[in-house]
Amino acid sequence: MADTGKGSSVAGCNDSCGCPSPCPGGNSCRCRMREASAGDQGHMVCPCGEHCGCNPCNCPKTQTQTSAKGCTCGEGCTCASCAT
């Protein structure tokens, strides 16, 4: 039986995290829950530290505004989470 690790939360791979779907496997294709300070709700982040759904790891960072408030994606990014 796999050890899930108490206190950690891992979401499945999806476009919002900049991961290929279906996932090829491995730690590079995971979202991780990061707890915010002062009891605030945690944020989902890619292994590279980017916020899921805003700057998918496989998309370059630019200031292109998307339909999601405050999110940016690189020009030419084809991730569904970057669609306007």
Curated annotation (Swiss-Prot):
The gene is MT4A. It comes from the Eukaryota. The lineage of its organism: Eukaryota, Viridiplantae, Streptophyta, Embryophyta, Tracheophyta. It is found in: Cytoplasm; Nucleus; Cell membrane. Induction: By abscisic acid (ABA) and jasmonic acid. Down-regulated by gibberellin. Expressed specifically in seeds. Pfam families: Metallothio_PEC (PF02068). Disulfide bonds: none annotated. PANTHER family: EC PROTEIN HOMOLOG, METALLOTHIONEIN-LIKE PROTEIN 4A-RELATED. This is Metallothionein-like protein 4A. Metallothioneins have a high content of cysteine residues that bind various heavy metals. Functions as a metal chelator of copper (Cu) and zinc (Zn). Plays a role in storing and distributing Zn ion in seed. Plants silencing both MT4A and MT4B have reduced seed weight and reduced seedling growth after germination. The keyword Cell wall biogenesis/degradation does not apply. GO terms for cellular component: cytoplasm; nucleus; plasma membrane. Keywords: Cell membrane, Cytoplasm, Membrane, Metal-binding, Metal-thiolate cluster, Nucleus, Zinc. Belongs to the metallothionein superfamily. Type 15 family. GO terms for molecular function: zinc ion binding. InterPro entries: Metallthion_15. Residues 1-26 are annotated as: Disordered. The keyword Nucleus applies.
